[in-house]
Amino acid sequence: MNDLNAALEQRMVDLGKRRSRQQIAKATERGSWAETPAGVILMKKALAPAIKMFEEWRAEALVAKNANYRQRAAVILKDIDPAMAMYVAVRQALSSASNRDSFKYSALSIGNSLAMEILADKFEEKAGALYRTVMRNARARGLGADRQAMAMRKANQWAGVIKEPWDGPTRLIVGTTLLGFVVEATGVIQIVKRRDGKKESQRLELLPKVMEWSERYHEAFGLTRPVYLPLAVPPKDWTTVDDGGFHDVLSFRQRVVTRAFEGQLDALRARPPTQVYDALNKLQNTPWQINARVLAVMDHVWKENLPFPGLPEREDQPIPTPPPEVDAAEKGSDIRKQWRRKVRAIHDHNAEQRSLRFEFVRALNIAQDYSAMDAFYFAYRMDFRGRIYSTGTTLNPQGPDHVRGLLQFSEGVPLGLHGLKWLGIHGANLFGNDKVSFEDRYEWACQNTRNAHLSATDPFASRWWTEADKPWQFLAWCIEWSQAMSMTDPTAFVSHLAISLDGSCNGIQHFSAMLRDEVGGAAVNLVPGPKPQDIYGRVAELTMKKLCTLAAKDSPDAWVYDGWYRFGIDRKMVKRQVMVLPYGGTFRSCLDYTRDAYRERVAAGAEDPFGAPVTGDELKPVPMLAKLIWESIGDTVIAARAAMSWLQQVTRVATKYGQKLTWVTPSGLTVFQDYRETKTRQVKTRFLGALVYSRLDEPTDKLAKSRQVTSVAPNFVHSLDASALVATVNRSAGHGVTAWMMIHDSYGTHAGRTEILARDLRACFVQMYEQHDVLKEFLEGVKATLPVEAHAELPELPARGNLDITDVYESQYFFA
């Protein structure tokens, strides 16, 4: 088995190396070596000094009295954007040097590329409709950058729109001039003389030491990009930041914290978070297997391209041809804006679906490879806040619905009486019937036993399961529920499914607990109730009440409020706005999500109270509604707003004195938050892509004050939900739980042991907030980094409410 695991780890490395080599080879073959990892590094290093050199030269050359080819080039380039010009030059020069092209060819390539950029700008300005038609067609045909430019050039010649910029000699002068700057600025390109028979030519080459470096770098780059797969044996226990996870070839490349801030790993070495390591190791020891029946259905659906939900689209949506009124409209007109928005949405959708297709096919292939294994395992790591993540690529227990539907625990556990109840509740939750009591959910499952049986026995003929919110996990449930209910004693059924218990807007649960907020706590099920509280429904209901009041007033805006009231604000209209609040949500995000929800609902067929969908720029109704939703959120989750504001105030003081943030979580993890300013610019071209590069002449070692302030609340609350998860895993392990599916605020185990997990997660949450005043501890940590005279600038701790945190013990819908 160890030999098998060693082979698997080597395969992960080999797959990563092969993928990296293929990408580098493709870029080099198409003359785009500058797009390789080594090329990008050289570009970013060279671009800023090359731009500066160009700007200084042009300023001097334009006032010089002696006439030469370089002064002529300065006149030609006097209106060119320096960043764009040097981006084109550096990119082309590096690619030419890697290919050992002649100096003349390289210079002409630069001149031609720059000329095409100028031609495209002027072509669109003079004949926008034709330009867009040509480019849209070229992209739809999948043409590369060079052929797109050729198509644009031919269309211009055919239509006679504008005269092409620069003749051949001029392009050579421009390219030669810019190439000289590149050679000087990069320090990595040499011009060498080569003899071919009697003919001698000058060629561009990368310096030998640069070629050697790039080869070593690309080899190392491939090693650092493994394709993570499940392991054949339990992963190595984490004992230090550098030791754990993988056993063999990957072991020396892994650290327990991904993307740690400078100094954090040293802090963890000095103060090991043993509780966190214990939880990581328990999760790593959870054995998994592929759900063969779900895999068979999914594989057939994909191969036959059947119209089943929950999977990515197999084909791109076609890009529509603009109607005549769009082509005839003036540039910048509303009709043009609306059309561009529509087309952009399709492009974005297609790009997203292509990515999802790639991830899905990879997950499906991995599942097929592992389908014969009785048990496999996932290595786990954490981010700088302590949030725990599986390292599996595409196939892992924290994946989307179709991935989680493919996975089940290798170990089976008899349901028992409690387990049968939890299995039934789980089915109702997956279907979307999760706003009612547990009793009603279980009753729903019992009433739909026949539907579940039909879906399980013939999922292609009986498609009831496809109506579920999470269809692929629900199909797995149908199979087990059908089997259990077919037995004389369903409680004896041995279940392999992971039963999930989800927090109710978990970030707000934590903020309400730390400040003992009885209003917010009641809204997110920190107190007992006969059925689950719906914070999204509460916010929607409060917003509707405000709309009703404002619509009845004699004011110029009453018609807007009346329109929204008639439109109806339901939980879906406010859900995203509420969800993101504890994770750094602002009024700006509230406005954006409100606009999105409105557009989606109108697109789905709802009658628009304002006559036309929101176009984005001039509309008054959406900001007015967003303001009311934002107020209603604040009225519902008072403590969350107060705690977030307080955290930001403390952070402002710390950043004023140049101090990063450090705090220790209840699980014993030392967290660093130390965002630094990065001064960047982005160069965009029409045919050669874009590059974000550093301005090397500007400081990059300053604290990013704004980011420090806006990030502290989400990072702080994430560190707390991670602590609760760690405590829950460790406690439940002591009570007999042996397998977990944990996703931040969603806890899962076998149905037969869900009662234990439900009890322990409540105990851990209550004890965490009984034993820790997390805001006070955070404040003391900040004080320790500041001079004494700065302490007076720190705000007082926010006031606490009267919530009895022990009510969580009796709240059955706290995690449900």
Residue map of PLM features:
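C-terminal, well-structured subdomains that either form a transmembrane helix-short loop-helix hairpin
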Residues: 715-723, 728-732, 738-754
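Non-catalytic nucleic-acid-binding interfaces of large nucleic-acid enzymes and RNP effectors
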Residues: 1-578, 582-715, 731, 735, ...
